[in-house]
Amino acid sequence: MSDDKSQIKIKFFTNEEDVSLQVSDAPLYVPVSLKRYGLSEVVNQLLGNDGENDDSKPIPFDFLIDGVLLRTSIQDYLTKNGLSSETFLSLEYTRAVLPPSFLASFNNEDWISSLDTINKTLPSVTLSNMMISQPKILSGSYDGIVRTYNMSGNVEKQYVGHSGPIRAVKWVSPTRIVSAGNDRQVRLWKTSADDGSIPEEDEEAEDGRTLAILEGHKAPVVALAVENTSNRILSAGYDHSIGFWSTNYKEMTTIQPLEYDSNVLSSSSKKRRKMALQDSTIRRRSPLALLDSHTQPVEDVIFDNTDATVGYSVSQDHTIKTWDLVTSRCIDTRSTGYSLLSIVQLPKSKLLATGSSARHINLHDPRISNNTTEQTTSKLVGHTNFVVSLAASPNNDNMFASGSHDGTVKVWDIRTDKSLYTITRESPEAVKGADKVFAVSWDNEIGIISGGQDKKIQINKGSDISK
């Protein structure tokens, strides 16, 4: 407690569901010099958490005033907002997010461009009517190989077929994955479920083999999104277009193989040229639709969290576009002053977070009219290089993680404009200047997974970080 004689009248309240965390809302006076730690002490005293036994261990809390996280003393908050100590403040308290600690690092053969996870609680499993016993990690690499890892760090299976660097990977179900790369292809692959169950249309293919090659893009395909309720896929291409596909190849039109340009295939790899010839026996499918409106390469694409008929994309043309996937029309365009490289939607608030070449992250509300002057609700600053990957927290509607070419992953809460934590690379290979992060994913069982230039899949997890 501070000796500062200046005090302020406050009351505490919480929206925590745990009734044991409720304190009286009776007003009390506290020193204006108190910060988060001191306020946390007060709440723990009110809760009777004296630390004398395991049941009364003090709990770290965060505090919000009018929905904004308090990151300074009460006095600094009052000064910044032009308020006096005569003000009566209502302070919301919630369990604090603890720092994510380094858990493990898995080796990969080349730079990691993309990551995804699967576990028994995710829609890719629950909507498939299949089972999975342990979480798994899916990686796409610049060596052209897709890999699945178990939680011991062992590669369970490799998927070889792309003739250039992989740029995007996603789980579709426990028995199916999708990948995309610089060879302009989107590929559906067959894997195997823990319980041995295989969808009927997959039975003829061997494990680890390509079910279908999805063709339509005329330049590298750098991002994928999968919508499990509608069984649809979106792909972002450097040909300025977005591909709209089905996870079931039988729903798409059969086509003949595209002619391969010599500059698409790796000029130094006879093996990959031979691989391309072998692909001539694999079924090919055309997109359900190609969405055209962007004027520069499309960097990322997602489905709306609650409406499978809506998609969002970001591009080097500085815009965020909203798509009606029923009519294949662009229904909204929002312009910024910089190339946009990544996008994610936060579930409850519906806000779109976009990472940029200008090193910051903007929050946009797609429900605000495009005609309004202020389309950006907030700007989050902290990275010192391109922000190329974003992942929403699986359990906290206000939080997400960002991966950057500055070699860090940052954890953000939209209720404050500064990052909560910064995760750095743990591998000795990640020397300054060769430590770019290209991919980040956030799994409710595994933790925060990141990968990039150091050829490592790094896992960080903090107690209660998602709560």
UniProtKB/Swiss-Prot annotation:
UniProt GO MF annotations: ribonucleoprotein complex binding
Entries under SUPFAM superfamilies matching the protein: WD40 repeat-like
Pfam families: NLE (PF08154), WD40 (PF00400)
WD repeat ranges per the UniProt record: 120-159, 161-199, 216-255, 293-333, 335-374, 382-422, 432-467
GO BP field: chromosome organization; maturation of 5.8S rRNA from tricistronic rRNA transcript (SSU-rRNA, 5.8S rRNA, LSU-rRNA); maturation of LSU-rRNA from tricistronic rRNA transcript (SSU-rRNA, 5.8S rRNA, LSU-rRNA); protein-RNA complex remodeling
GO CC list: nucleoplasm; PeBoW complex; preribosome, large subunit precursor
Region (Sufficient for interaction with ERB1 and association with 66S pre-ribosomes): 105-467
Entry-linked SMART domains: WD40 (SM00320)
Keyword Transport: no
Entry's localization field: Nucleus, Nucleolus; Nucleus, Nucleoplasm
Stretch list, region Ubiquitin-like (UBL) domain: 8-95
Keywords: Nucleus, Repeat, Ribosome biogenesis, rRNA processing, WD repeat
InterPro entries with a match to the protein in the record: G-protein_beta_WD-40_rep, NLE, WD40/YVTN_repeat-like_dom_sf, WD40_repeat_dom_sf, WD40_rpt, WDR12/Ytm1
Domain of life assignment: Eukaryota
Known role: Component of the NOP7 complex, which is required for maturation of the 25S and 5.8S ribosomal RNAs and formation of the 60S ribosome.
UniProt subunit comment: Component of the NOP7 complex, composed of ERB1, NOP7 and YTM1. The complex is held together by ERB1, which interacts with NOP7 via its N-terminal domain and with YTM1 via a high-affinity interaction between the seven-bladed beta-propeller domains of the 2 proteins. The NOP7 complex associates with the 66S pre-ribosome. Interacts (via UBL domain) with MDN1 (via VWFA/MIDAS domain).
Similarity-based family: Belongs to the WD repeat WDR12/YTM1 family.
HAMAP family in alphabetical order: WDR12 (MF_03029)
Protein name: Ribosome biogenesis protein YTM1
